């Protein structure tokens, strides 16, 4: 049985394991508000002395280092969440537009089973994917007592797809796209990527569907508060020459499990979307890493490895980010001085 330890005892346990506490009051606050398990168990693996049989922290390691890693990961998690919300909006809009344009705005038309592929058999629900999704959507359309569904039932006597799909999850949307037939699936991929249907290759289409699963995995991880920077999704991208060349992952790297299911691959998968809001949000992760790196200068190597980032690319990106902010600060100061003298 795991015994209870109050906050002061938790701090003493850490000190007995060779961890330095620079500010006991701040440490007590962190443990009270975020929890021992979240901060210590979540990130201690990166600061432990692997040569010791008993759990011992490396010399001169601090509790503040653990908290900084925790805060960095929390910032990455929040950005992943925001980025996937942008992707979800693009997917939902494209799906609703395609169904309305091709099948109409009445549920009896755009929720007609004949218009979709069966999909995989889901043993949990004892139904094919198509039947489970369509039954769920019909039930939402008929019975869910929320706005704007209520208003549309009363005023318009039907619920168009752009209203109905507001009530679905990213997982529902992803699975619904998978059961679409060729023309509708191609249209959605075209709308999301900005490529015309004639430009899309079979490889482009396959990559897009795989990317949806990767995005969903990272979204679920973020939503449940899991550690992000070393997360490896259970779903992996196949090797796609154009995509992997673009993100500087060689076939050899791929065989060594790079460019499959890590944070670096997830970052760049969002660049496939014409709406770059999600991808741009994730670039703010570099700012968070840069801020952490200012205090813990060797951690970027650990982060590069855990995130699946090629070391030279992360180093270049961080340097570019430093120069951007340095130049931005000088530019801001120069304009402020000019404004003073121009008054």
Show where each model-derived region lies.
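Long, contiguous internal "core" modules enriched in hydrophobic/ aromatic residues
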Residues: 1-329, 337
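Low-complexity, charge- and small-residue-enriched intrinsically disordered regions
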Residues: 336-343
């Amino acid at each position: 049985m795991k015994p209870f330890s109050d906050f002061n005892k938790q701090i003493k346990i850490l000190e007995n394991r060779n961890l330095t506490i620079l500010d006991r009051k701040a440490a007590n606050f962190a443990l009270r508000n975020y929890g021992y398990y979240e901060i210590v168990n979540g990130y201690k693996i990166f600061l432990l002395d692997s040569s010791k049989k008993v759990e011992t922290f490396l010399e001169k390691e601090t509790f503040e280092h653990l908290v900084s890693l925790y805060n960095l990961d929390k910032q990455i998690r929040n950005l992943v969440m925001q980025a996937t919300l942008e992707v979800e909006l693009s997917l939902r809009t494209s799906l609703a537009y395609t169904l309305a344009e091709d099948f109409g705005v009445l549920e009896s038309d755009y929720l007609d089973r004949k218009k979709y592929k069966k999909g995989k058999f889901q043993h949990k629900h004892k139904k094919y994917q198509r039947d489970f999704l369509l039954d769920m959507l019909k039930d939402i359309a008929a019975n869910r007592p929320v706005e704007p569904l209520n208003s549309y039932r009363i005023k318009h006597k039907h619920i168009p797809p752009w209203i109905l799909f507001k009530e679905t999850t990213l997982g529902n949307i992803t699975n619904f796209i998978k059961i679409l037939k060729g023309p509708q699936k191609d249209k959605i991929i075209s709308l999301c990527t900005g490529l015309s249907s004639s430009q899309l290759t079979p490889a482009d289409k396959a990559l897009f569907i795989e990317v949806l699963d990767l995005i969903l995995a990272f979204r679920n991880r973020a939503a449940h508060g899991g550690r992000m920077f070393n997360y490896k999704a259970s779903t992996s991208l196949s090797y796609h020459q154009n995509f992997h060349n673009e993100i500087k992952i060689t076939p050899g790297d791929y065989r060594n499990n790079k460019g499959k299911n890590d944070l670096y691959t997830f970052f760049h998968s969002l660049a496939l979307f014409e709406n770059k809001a999600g991808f741009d949000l994730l670039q703010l992760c570099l700012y968070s890493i840069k801020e952490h790196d200012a205090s813990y200068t060797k951690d970027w190597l650990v982060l590069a490895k855990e995130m699946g980032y090629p070391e030279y690319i992360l180093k270049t990106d961080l340097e570019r980010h430093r120069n951007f902010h340095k130049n931005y600060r000088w530019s801001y100061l120069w304009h402020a001085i000019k404004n003073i003298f121009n008054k």
